[in-house]
Amino acid sequence: MGLLETIQHPADLARLSDEQLVQLAQEIRDFLISNVAQTGGHLGPNLCVVELTLAIHRVFDSPRDSIIFDTGHQSYVHKLVTGRQHFSTLRQQGGLSGYADRGESVHDVVESSHASSSLSWADGISRARVLNGEGDRYVVAVIGDGALTGGMTWEALNNIAADKDRRVVIVVNDNGRSYAPTVGGLADYLRSLRPAIDSLRTHKAYEGNLDWTKNKLQNGGFLGQLMYKSLHAAKKGVKDWWAPQGLFEDLGMKYIGPVDGHDQKALESAMQTAKNYAGPVIVHAMTDKGRGYAPARADEADQFHAVGVIDPETGLPLDPSTAQSWTSVFAEEIAEIADERDDIVGITAAMLIPVGLHRMAERHPQRVIDVGIAEQHALTTAAGMAFGGLHPVVAMYATFLNRGFDQLLMDVALHKAGVTVVLDRAGVTGPDGPSHHGMWDLSMLQIIPGLHLAAPRDATRLREELREAVAISDAPTVLRYSKGNVGAEVEAIERLDDGVDILARRPAGSTENDVLLVSVGAMSEMSLQVANLLGAQGISSTVVDPRWVLPVPQSIIELAAQHRIVIVIEDGVRAGGVGSRIRQEMRAAGVDTALNEVGLPVEFLAHGSRGQVLDRVGLTAQKVAHDVVAQVLGTKVPFARPLPNEQITHTGQFPTL
């Protein structure tokens, strides 16, 4: 039996010798490589925090002390030492989450995997501890150097530093990367830091003597105050020369480091020093992403930040896909557009390769800007670029648009800025769970005045709609598409004057217009399946793809008036989505056709494959067709209306689909 199998609780780590800790760290790395290779997941980030996580759990007392992992994707080692070693289920439906999850363990605190929030959590928890008379409990926040590029971290630091009695330990896991190398002035600053004599500077006696001297000199008249200012300036100068950590200490935070993030004894010493100080402290640990796994270290792109199923020996995908992904289609097309237009600039929030801007960056490096993990800043700087005569294309995951909503509304839309926002991983994304599903965007974007929203159904439509988007210079445009591979081309049988594509219509010779199926984006294949199932029951249907769902095309309203019921199929939340907007436009035009919104419930959806998640919520062709048949027959609301001069007979019976 290996050491790892004997660890079921953090307290089990206390009995291990130095030699056993080294052995355990190696066992953990071997375990992660072997298991994540079979399921996929965040491998590189977890290989770099093995010793760091062990040190935290040996010095602090979880769950009495709260341990928070910013973004949470580096919590695998934490899971292992808190009794969760069934990694064969990682990111599988019903299995272990790829992030922290309160439903799994009392040791998990923050479930959201959106970056830069951990310090605000730490601020709030530590305040609650003090107010509840539990100020002796620690809060440890583990945050990467990449997440420190998010402005929210500095808002939290401003508050944490103001209260010297709260026991907050901020562990900066500095591997020089988020997905890719961390960029910006902060990254340069962190690289400049040098070791210092932290055990002295963070000792309570040192602080006490410093305060006593300060008070005596400041109360000693003009000469005393002059002497204090001189000594303070000298101290600061020596400190910044010896260890230029002034940024943190000028905020009022004690700084320890940099510490070798793979030296177990040094890490534990640093953690113990921070604990003994019993106030806000930053521990700066230098780590290697992908530590101990040669294929990860050799991966220049992101050092195996996230992998699919791979050969653990070589790191190569076991089933390399030859299909084209949505992201790669965008990457090719935006690079070609940039070749043609000098005013096109790309903006990414620390995700150059994942969102597909790398090809444009290879050809036009001066016209692709990585702003760090800063979606709010990305959108407002885009508005400024548009004012300056450029056309910015801001590419991000759909789930991260939530963070920049105010900037999109007030800085971009209010000023009618010609900015294109490209949302990757829209809809249900699968294994990464509730905080990564891009299911909120369709509802959020409905309320932004003047915004144009496109949802391409295939690669050809993505290319053409991207070009249409960047041709608009007086309003924001948004494109959204799914995660993974693009499906087969879905050709239209007709394109209407306002750009709406007719994908299928009633058989020739039929005079019935029962159902109008409005397919949003990648739901076209399902919509056509629904039409086929309805046709087998003698129910006629027309299938349309609006292409641009905002503003609602006039032809959609006209077609709605010609049918008995409208079914809008979308992979966003039903509340306030595309279906809801079409209903409002229909009513405003005096069209009283029944309409049913088919989409996702307003719930946080647990992880699983895309197909499994859609099946759980009933968003399948079989279920949708079954409901539509009932609505046409008049046994389920909303009832399909009779058309003028049409007599409809309701049977009240359900056919078998």
Swiss-Prot record:
Catalytic activity: D-glyceraldehyde 3-phosphate + pyruvate + H(+) = 1-deoxy-D-xylulose 5-phosphate + CO2
Biological process (GO), any one: isopentenyl diphosphate biosynthetic process, methylerythritol 4-phosphate pathway
Top-level taxon of origin: Bacteria
Pathway where it operates: Metabolic intermediate biosynthesis; 1-deoxy-D-xylulose 5-phosphate biosynthesis; 1-deoxy-D-xylulose 5-phosphate from D-glyceraldehyde 3-phosphate and pyruvate: step 1/1
Keywords from the named record: Isoprene biosynthesis, Magnesium, Metal-binding, Thiamine biosynthesis, Thiamine pyrophosphate, Transferase
Enzyme Commission (EC) number: 2.2.1.7
Co-factor binding comment: Binds 1 Mg(2+) ion per subunit.
Annotated binding of Mg(2+), by residue: 145, 175
One GO cellular component term: cytosol
PROSITE patterns (UniProt xref): TRANSKETOLASE_2 (PS00802)
Binding site for thiamine diphosphate: 73, 113-115, 146-147, 175, 293, 375
Homology family: Belongs to the transketolase family. DXPS subfamily.
NCBIfam families: dxs (TIGR00204), PRK05444.2-2 (NF003933)
Name of the molecule in the record: 1-deoxy-D-xylulose-5-phosphate synthase
